[in-house]
């Protein structure tokens, strides 16, 4: 470690120094679950029972975690949320979408539908980073989408069906919110996410919880002459998922870690337990920032401050990049802000795998570093 960077006393450090916003902290037990399956599951066919059973554990576990209503299905595919945006443009938007955008990731799906030559230009309702627009509807659209949690800015937006949206699917990007924020799945038609945030696994897989209306839309569009690459085909994903399979070979270790994390969550009380845990962690972070003379929550509206991704602005006299660098040199990693936001801030992951007490210790470390830096 450079002599110019302060050393953080051991008694201040968190038990685990991983605070990334995805990939996020992986529990040792998840790695052990992969090791335990080294010869029984790893390196075996994804069309046979051992791997299909793991996919089934993921699907059944998510059904329990989110208390799925009758007729909702857990659908899996390869490629992560980025691939799902393309799949949704091909297979869920009939003609025109409405997007709420308030950061880097909530804007990405809007860019996809805007660029799709077979769709009309979307309606885009925007808000500045750090704030969020009110969910709304438009009679001209057949899908309304927004992010449950905007990972780039630390803004969360509750999930509820906008008034007048009866003819539109409600599609929620829950990439960093699923498993850590409250949701009533019946308020959504498509609740999609990836496993590298709250579910403490690796990326490269997408999950979409689909309502009967969404499944009908998939079948409806599939019956038209709209071309779609097989890899992005939602009918193919729906059919394979019903068999506890994916269209092409999945990352089996990712699924093993994913399944273990879901079961860990359910064993402790399910989504209610997860939400209470992230509420505990985030209250520790925001209470500290509000009491600090150099730190301020970036999101000014308390109701929009994320329970899973905390963004904290630092006073201009303090170099946040130097603080993050010092933390990293002391084994406390991934507190840097989202690169494109360009703010003097820290960004802290507070997913269920992260111990609330470690968040408290992190704040003490930040105080120490700021006090020691020239």
Regions found by a protein language model. Give the residues of each.
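Active-site C-terminal subdomain of aminotransferase-like
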Residues: 25, 196-286
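Conserved N-terminal alpha-helix of the aminotransferase class I/II PLP-enzyme fold
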Residues: 38-87, 108-112
